[in-house]
């Protein structure tokens, strides 16, 4: 009886550890101090003065980089963030923001890159996208994370049956012991640290 309890405890502990390993966490650099930073740009832009001073977290693609006296201004085309605060690929832009970072950031290292920024909202300013007037939300960045794109090969699911012999007609058709035609693999682009 005691052996059974120990086995069950071991299985439960292993299952719990496996479940925890699948959890996605926000990197420390962009955690911020608020448990729920503002992430809805449409809501913020409807009344930006109400959100001044509140912590926000936005991410997307850096469209432009302006080096100014003592700071760098990133123009970011924002997209929704996933549970790990990574920009979601393939989503349309929700709008643009200016993210002011203290110090110098080299435009070569940031233009066209995916980033997530966190910090207090400082207001909204008028600007332009091309020749079109646009109102940008502005935030003071207290932390940022630059992301990388990686391609992964995704194989189709394999049969689970260890005694799977192959297609109908074996051994006269295709296959033999353990043969399985998985079909084409697909290449998927993912955002990684």
UniProtKB/Swiss-Prot annotation:
Pfam families: Slp (PF03843). A lipid is attached at residue 23 (N-palmitoyl cysteine). It is a lipid-anchor. InterPro entries: OMP_Slp. It is found in: Cell membrane. The keyword Ligase does not apply. Residues 1-22 form the signal peptide. It comes from the Bacteria. Its main location: membrane. Keywords: Cell membrane, Lipoprotein, Membrane, Palmitate, Signal. One of its GO terms (cellular component) is outer membrane. A lipid is attached at residue 23 (S-diacylglycerol cysteine). This is Uncharacterized lipoprotein YeaY. It comes from Escherichia coli (strain K12).
């Amino acid at each position: 009886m005691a052996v059974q309890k120990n086995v069950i405890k071991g299985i439960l502990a292993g299952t719990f550890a496996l479940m925890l390993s699948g959890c996605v966490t926000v990197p420390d650099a962009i955690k911020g101090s608020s448990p729920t930073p503002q992430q809805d740009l449409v809501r913020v832009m409807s009344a930006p003065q109400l959100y001044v001073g509140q912590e926000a977290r936005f991410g997307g693609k850096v469209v432009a980089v302006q080096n100014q006296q003592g700071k760098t201004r990133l123009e970011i085309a924002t997209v929704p963030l996933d549970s790990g605060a990574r920009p979601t690929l393939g989503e349309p832009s929700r709008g643009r923001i200016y993210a002011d970072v203290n110090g110098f950031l080299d435009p070569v290292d940031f233009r066209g890159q995916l980033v997530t920024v966190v910090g207090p909202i400082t207001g909204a300013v008028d600007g332009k996208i091309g020749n079109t007037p646009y109102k940008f939300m502005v935030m003071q960045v207290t932390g940022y994370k630059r992301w990388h794109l990686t391609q992964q090969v995704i194989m189709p699911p394999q049969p689970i049956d260890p005694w799977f012999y192959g297609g109908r007609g074996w051994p006269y058709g295709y296959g033999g012991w353990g043969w399985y035609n998985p079909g084409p693999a697909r290449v998927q682009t993912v955002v990684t640290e």
